[in-house]
Structures are given as structure tokens and as C-alpha cells.
Amino acid sequence: MVGKKLAGRLPDVHLNEAGRTQAGNLAAAFSGLPIKAIFSSPLERTLETAQPIAREHDLTVEILPDLLEIDFGNWQGQDLEELKKSSDWKYVQEQPADFRFPMGESFAEAQQRMAACLTHIGEIYQKDDLVVCVGHSDMIRLSVAHFLGIPLNDFQRLRIETASVTVLYLSDGKANFGAINHVLSFPENLKPGD
């Protein structure tokens, strides 16, 4: 989101000061880890998150288009309050498995794209290799749901915070999670009942 708009794949959406601080905190947290590679969505905000981690490890960020945000089609750049008034909003919240964004992709297509990308990365690196993928919260939720066998209609029950860490172990065609939505500091925007 940008302010109160659905950012999606909009170009020129950069991290704000808080986001840059979070990216620096991630780089510091990862500084002692033997990272072999770092991959990112091509969008500016993910590259700006990935670059401090890459610099810390003397690596180059490798751009993977399959890590891109969901293609929200005509919804991209639209005011969220206006979208919430649309007849499709409730449908998206309750039956996302059956929804395709107008002029965009479906959640099922986005999930398949992300799962295939992560599976491919798991196949080209050794079992104990550590790689970092920087992506988008909905795409991370979709991939967590995929690898845990959570029905697509329930993926929105998962919460992924900005600059959180999800650790996925892929080996011999099997997936296990070491962490989901691990935050380095408690998100300020969380209040009881959120």
C-alpha cells in the first residue's frame, strides 16, 4: 500500500524512512550469516530492502520477476476505501481462490508462480545453503499457505508484517518452516484486536 492506495506493481514506490531503517536492521541481523545469494522482486521497494543485505555480504542482488507482487490489474493504484465499496471486495476477502483481478492475475496464478520460483531456488542450491528472497507480503502469505497445505481461501488469515522474516527449508522436495513472520521489533501499528 502507498498511503491509502493499493501500490501493487506501481513503479517509483520507494521505502520511507521507517522502511529504510527496517532494511538496515535486517542487514545487521543477517550480518553474521553465510548467505550464498540474495534474490528480489524487481520493484524499487524490495530492491531497497535487499541492497543493504547484499552490501553486508558483498553480493549482488539478483532480480527474479517471479517474486513480483500480485498483478492487481485495474485495482493497482486505486484508493483502498473506494475498493472496499466495490462489489468484488467482499468476494476477494471470502473467496480469493475463485477471484481474478480485472485485467490482472488470480491468487491461484500468483501462488503457483511464487511456489514454483521458491521450489526452483531450492533445487539449485545445496541443502544447507542460505539464500535470501525479498518479496511482498501477499506473495509470502500465498507461498506459506502453499507449502503448509492451507486452502487458498484461508491464506488471508496469515499475517506477514513489513520487513519480517520467514524461514523456509526446502530439501528433497519437502518444505519446512523455521519461522513465519518473525519481526525484529514489535510492530508499532499492532494493537490488541488488530
Where are these regions (language model features)?
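Short glycine/proline- and acidic residue-enriched helix-loop micro-motifs
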Residues: 88-109
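Amphipathic, non-transmembrane alpha-helical scaffold segments
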Residues: 16, 20, 43, 107, ...
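Generic beta-sheet signal
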Residues: 129-135
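Alpha-helix capping/helix-boundary segments
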Residues: 45, 139-140
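An N-terminal RHG(E/S)-centered segment typical of histidine phosphatases
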Residues: 1-36, 51, 55-59, 78, ...
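Acidic, low-complexity terminal tails and accessory targeting/binding regions
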Residues: 59, 70-81, 123, 127-129, ...
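Phosphate-coordination/substrate-recognition cap region in phosphate-metabolizing enzymes
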Residues: 24-90
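Generic structural signal for well-ordered alpha-helical scaffold segments
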Residues: 24-28, 111, 115-123, 144
